[in-house]
Amino acid sequence: MAKYVSFFTYTSDAWARMIQSPGDRTATIRQVADSLGGSVECVYWMFGTHDGMVIIDVPDSISGAAMSIAAGSSGAFKTVETHELLTQEQLGQVLSRSKDATQAFQPPGQQS
């Protein structure tokens, strides 16, 4: 499973609708994750640049992108910012492959 974090900011219209009719937004997020074969690890609300964040586990990057696009296209959000999360083990693999790529990379104008 791939793990993603999405930071989101609601529109003023979405906030107004939630004030008038509060509901369990976490349940809605779980339904979306379930529809993609995933699960919700946690949902938190916050003050500041973003209104909340969710961490989800989904089968692959296609599912992670689909969840982000579904939320972003709903009209309820000013912003949805999604990032794949890596474990320490995955970071080690990334750094190992980066070493190989760094050795192969040639900056523009420095061709062999």
Where are these regions (language model features)?
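A compositional/biophysical signature of low hydrophobicity enriched in polar/charged and small residues
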Residues: 1-112
